[in-house]
Amino acid sequence: MGKQPIDLLMQPSWRIIDQSSLGPYFDAKQSFAMDDTLCASVGKGESPATARSWVHHRTIVLGIQDTRLPFLEDGVKLLEDEGYRVIVRNSGGLAVVLDEGVLNISLIFEDEKKGIDIDRGYEAMTELVRRMLRPHHAEIEAYEIKGSYCPGSYDLSIGGRKFAGISQRRLRGGTAVQIYLCADKSGSERADLIRRFYQAALKDKSNDTKGVYPDIRPETMASLSELLRTDITVQDLMLALLTELKELSGRLYAAGLSPEEEMVFEKNLTRMLERNEKVFGTQESLD
């Protein structure tokens, strides 16, 4: 019998880093630097498998492809005028919306020993979300939702409407599988914001000669609260996450960064700041 998605979730212990309630001053650049740091320490066997939860207030995270938009400045201005911070992550993919109603989860595994092929990481995250939402008896499907923002083959949807997207980053012997879960508020309003961003940054669809940027239809996206017709909060999802990981492992324990990880984190954060300065031309500090 081949390896199952659940095998990857069944760890002897899970290290938990909960950054879901740090508030509006927690910058998303810190999150991407954090996951790169954890990839390195988990990849070297210095840390067990780690689950990190994170929430960022009113932030648009662009992918590297988005930085090539012909009128990027106009798109960024539109987002900033709506009260959003805009950052560029250190990986591919396209723009996503983060706010206080979106829970992000990163699962960081050691790559080499587990022989994680790309699909297996995605499938493990999909399995985890299905387990988290079991009490709601919803049929969760994983396939690309055309018309959504940052579409991919592991978009998670209920009844054809997307509520989550999964990405993966491999670095220094570690793999970070990342998901955003839209808990509450309006999924279509989030999608409409990204639709207007691309409209401003492209001006004309003919400027997208390679067909890279999605033609967003806001009605393809929804939050879990909308789809399940009940109030689902970030806190509800956090509790479900911890409950499932506890069932799947020998022990859970909370641990911040070690002194060695702190040093690596500072270097990774500097790289993120430099990347963003290169794109947006403004120097910043997160002290």
Swiss-Prot record:
Q: Name one Pfam family in it.
A: LplA-B_cat
Enzyme Commission (EC) number: 2.3.1.204
- Provide the disulphide bond pattern: none
Tell me where on the tree of life, at the top rank, the source sits: Bacteria
Catalytic reaction annotation:
N(6)-octanoyl-L-lysyl-[glycine-cleavage complex H protein] + L-lysyl-[lipoyl-carrier protein] = N(6)-octanoyl-L-lysyl-[lipoyl-carrier protein] + L-lysyl-[glycine-cleavage complex H protein]
> Which residues does the UniProt record annotate as the domain BPL/LPL catalytic?
45-253
GO biological processes: lipoate biosynthetic process; protein modification process
Query: Which residues participate directly in catalysis?
Result: 150 (acyl-thioester intermediate)
In this UniProt entry, which residues are annotated as the site Lowers pKa of active site Cys?
Answer: 162
Q: Show the Gene3D superfamilies listed in the entry.
A: Bira Bifunctional Protein, Domain 2
Query: Coiled coil: which residue ranges?
Result: none
Pathway(s) the chain acts in: Protein modification; protein lipoylation via endogenous pathway; protein N(6)-(lipoyl)lysine from octanoyl-[acyl-carrier-protein]
Q: Which GO terms describe its molecular function?
A: lipoyl(octanoyl) transferase activity
Q: Which UniProt keywords apply?
A: Acyltransferase, Transferase
User: Record's family?
Assistant: Belongs to the octanoyltransferase LipL family.
Cross-referenced HAMAP family, in alphabetical order?
LipL (MF_02119)
Described function: Catalyzes the amidotransfer (transamidation) of the octanoyl moiety from octanoyl-GcvH to the lipoyl domain of the E2 subunit of lipoate-dependent enzymes.
Q: What else is known?
A: The reaction proceeds via a thioester-linked acyl-enzyme intermediate.
- What is the name listed in the Swiss-Prot or TrEMBL entry for this protein? Octanoyl-[GcvH]:protein N-octanoyltransferase
Task: Name its species.
Answer: Bacillus velezensis (strain DSM 23117 / BGSC 10A6 / LMG 26770 / FZB42) (Bacillus amyloliquefaciens subsp. plantarum)
Gene giving rise to this polypeptide:
lipL
